[in-house]
């Protein structure tokens, strides 16, 4: 779908791609705020989905999206010297974040673990199953799996379960604060 003469939005068959920055009602408030201030937002599409199909495997099957085109965002935390360090890790959906080795070393903590879901939801302002790397709290690192960079289409959360954002892998690397990490997913 062409948004204007300059930008062709990413799309999925059977779903209407809309310019995400022009449809804040379809994303979580922190995501809408981030889209409003990010130059890359013009290349981001949003699609409405059945909220019961928000989990990656269900969405992938229902909408014929290959797992390699899915970007899962998990929130990991650890502490050192009383200083908590948090990172959102975006990994290709057919892999799992290497939390115990790579993420732990990147955070420079002795032990890294998934942030409890209630905290991740409360602190991000996003819904369970919809957390996305765009619009996260200040101080959270954004780690992006290098395997996603060459994907022409990556489906990520929108902050809510009833929609997804569509981006290119290249655009993920351009997210505010993004750090591309080789081998982040295994």
Where are these regions (language model features)?
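Extended, low-hydrophobicity, polar/charged segments
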Residues: 1-186
């Amino acid at each position: 779908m062409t948004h204007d003469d300059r930008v062709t939005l990413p799309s999925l068959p059977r779903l209407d791609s809309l310019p995400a920055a022009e449809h804040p009602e379809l994303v979580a408030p922190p995501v809408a705020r981030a889209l409003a201030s990010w130059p890359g937002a013009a290349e981001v599409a949003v699609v409405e989905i059945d909220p019961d199909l928000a989990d990656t495997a269900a969405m992938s099957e229902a909408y014929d999206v290959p797992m390699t085109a899915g970007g899962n965002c998990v929130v990991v935390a650890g502490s050192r010297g009383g200083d908590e360090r948090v990172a959102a890790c975006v990994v290709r959906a057919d892999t799992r974040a290497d939390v115990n080795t790579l993420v732990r070393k990147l955070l420079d903590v002795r032990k890294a673990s998934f942030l409890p879901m209630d905290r991740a939801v409360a602190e991000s302002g996003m819904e369970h199953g919809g957390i996305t790397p765009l619009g996260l709290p200040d101080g959270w690192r954004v780690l992006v799996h290098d395997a996603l960079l060459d994907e022409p289409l990556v489906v990520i959360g929108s902050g809510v379960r009833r929609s997804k954002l569509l981006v290119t892998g290249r655009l993920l690397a351009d997210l505010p604060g993004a750090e591309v990490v080789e081998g982040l997913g295994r």
